C-alpha cells in the first residue's frame, strides 16, 4: 500500500493546485485502505521538480511490512552533507596513502616533499610521474563507476543494476582490443583510448537506433544485453586471431583491468569524458528522485521519462567509456558502492549520487593499494581483485532480494 500526496505551486503544465496523486493497493481482505494520521506516517518529506514549477511536501506512506525500495528518507537531512564530506575525505586520504604505497615504500614526509618538488630526484619521479597519475585515475574512475551504478539503479529501480548493463564497457573494451590486435596501439600512443571511447559511443548510438527513443526498460535492457554479447564475441575473436602470442597476452592483461603504467596523458584523455558523463548524471538527479514514485506519477509531475532514460544511458556510456579506455575492464565497483551508501543515507536516488561516487573512488583506491601490497610473484590486476570481492557480494544481493526480483521488470 502506498499513498503519495503532492502539492503543486506554479507549475506551467496545467497541474492541479493541491492535487493529490494516490496509488493504492487493496488489502487481501478487500477493505479500502484509509490514510493514517500524520503522527503515524512512516515516510518523510522531500522536494521534487514538476516541469518548471515545484511540487512540495511529497509524502510517502508505506507500511512497515513493505519491503520495496522507496524514496522515503530513512536518514535525517542533516546527515547527508556530513556523511558526504566524510566519504570524500576518506577517498582523499586513501589517495594520499596510495602515493606512498608500493614496492618502494615512502614515508608521509617524503611523499609531501616529493609532491611539492623537494626531496631527491628518484622520489620525485616515483611520486609525481608514476603514482600521482595512478591515484588521480583511481579517484576519477572509481567515482564515475559508483555514480553510474547509483544512477542506473535509480533509473531501473533495481538494486542489481550496474554500468555494464547496456553494453558500453564491453564495447569500449572491444574497441581497445581491436587496436591492440592490429598493432596500432604501438604505433600511436593515443590510438587505444580513442578507439575505446569511440566504440562506447557507437554502442550507445546502435542501442538507441535499435530500441528507439520511447522504448521501455525491457527493450533497452534486451538490446544492451545483445550488444554486450556481440562485443564479447568480437573480443574473443580478436584474441583468437591475434597475430602472435605476445599480442594475445597483451590483450588478456589489458582486459583484466589495471592502473599500472599510466601517465598524465591518460588522465588528460579520460578526465573530460568522465566529467561530462558525471555532469549529465548529476543534472538529472531530481528527475531520478521523482521517478522513484513510479513512471505514471513522474510523468504527471512533468518528467519526460523517455528523455531521462536517454540522458542517463548517454551519461553512463560517456563516463564509463572514458574510464574503460585507460584502465581496462574494472567491474563491480558500480554495483557495490550504492549499496554501501544506502544504510547511511537512505534510498533517495538524488542523495545517493555523490556519496556513491565517493565510495566508488575509495573502493578503487583501496583495491589499487592492496594489489601493490599483496605479496605475489606477479602483479595482481586491480580488476581481478574487485571481481573477487564483488562476485560474492553480488550473489548475496541476489539471495537477499530474490523474492522481490521474482516479479520481473516493469
Q: Where are the language model's segments positioned?
A:
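Alpha-helical transmembrane segments in inner-membrane proteins
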Residues: 46, 50-410
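Short linear/disordered segments characteristic of secreted peptide precursors
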Residues: 8-11, 28
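Ala/Thr-enriched low-complexity intrinsically disordered regions
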Residues: 19, 23-24, 38, 42-43, ...
